[in-house]
Amino acid sequence: LGAAVAHAALTPRKTSAYQPQPDPDRAMAYAEKLSAMIRCDTTSYANVREPEKFERFHALLAGLFPLVHEKLERTDIDGNLLYYWPGRAHDRPIVLMSHQDVVPAEGTWEHAPFSGDIADGKVWGRGASDTKCSVMAFFQAVEELLAAGYEPANDVYIASSCTEEWAGDGAPKLVAELKRRGVRPFLVCDEGGGIITE
């Protein structure tokens, strides 16, 4: 019985035949935003605080995602960002978690690590996959939903630390702030694979 339940839980089901049409202009707009984020060097080092790097990045985010910064409550905890988007209900909040910092760029690169080059259908550079892509995706999704006048069913938090790459205190500070507010997330979306068990 356990195997049958696991199989049923893990087997994808076809939920829709909908296939979005390619939109090259939209894809390029997304690529350009991610490119700008990559060009903003947010390299972090263990126990070295360089707040000016993250202040520049935060200013960039405000320019790229104006509705997020106009409509959501923003809390900055030593460069770690927490945005709050109130929903119609508050019992099943979600947290969209990512990090702003990147590891030092070492070795040989096909494209310069902070070039943000858009080439061969990709955005190149440090943070393209770890994980300014997540920062961009979360902010862009909320930006577009705000533009459409969408109100979430439950509270949404965007949490983004600036010390993840060296296991610093950023994420713990964000968690402490959520706990202080009495937030018990129903769902946390973070980088990495899915977790299907407690």
Regions found by a protein language model. Give the residues of each.
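Acidic/His- and Gly-rich active-site-bordering loop/insert found
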Residues: 2-131, 147-154
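Acidic/histidine-rich catalytic neighborhood of metal-dependent amide-processing enzymes
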Residues: 123, 129-198
